[in-house]
């Protein structure tokens, strides 16, 4: 079996980042790659390396001003796509609005090849019906009755 090479781009995290979680998810993802017998690289440079899979934290939108960290994200995703390979994105915790950014239980979103429902694969074809119950318990969240006024998230 051929080993796959996975590169996580630490330079895709903004220099002014104050959340250790953003770089920690990249580091732990690479540790998991290595633990499963493949080659994992946590890359601090801004150049794009040869790989089978590129991983970024966050996303870059089409009309974003390309600061250095956003260029790394953009080029990592583009390079994989042009070569017929994949990108993994770790995007923000959906529950930051309620529990804050530094809650010890992080539920980040991971997707492949995009972050939108029409472009990304969230591997959600067979969801675990108990998963929401676990998240509610871990974060102390509860669903509220449907309402049509105010600010809300529809689940």
Per-region residue spans from a language model:
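Catalytic-core helical/loop segments in enzymes performing group transfer/polymerization on anionic/lipid-linked
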Residues: 1-154
């Amino acid at each position: 079996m051929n080993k796959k090479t996975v590169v996580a781009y630490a330079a895709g995290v903004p220099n002014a980042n104050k959340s250790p979680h953003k770089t920690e998810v990249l580091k732990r993802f690479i540790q998991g790659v290595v633990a499963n017998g493949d080659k994992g690289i946590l890359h601090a440079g801004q150049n794009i390396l040869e790989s089978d899979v590129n991983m970024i934290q966050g996303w870059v939108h089409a009309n974003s001003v390309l600061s250095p960290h956003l260029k790394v994200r953009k080029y990592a995703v583009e390079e994989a796509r042009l070569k017929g390979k994949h990108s993994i994105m770790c995007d923000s915790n959906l529950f930051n609005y309620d529990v804050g950014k530094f809650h010890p239980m992080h539920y980040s979103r991971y997707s492949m090849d995009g972050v939108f429902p029409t472009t990304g694969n969230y591997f959600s074809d067979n969801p675990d019906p108990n998963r929401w119950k676990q998240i509610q318990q871990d974060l102390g969240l509860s669903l509220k009755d449907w309402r049509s006024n105010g600010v809300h998230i529809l689940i």
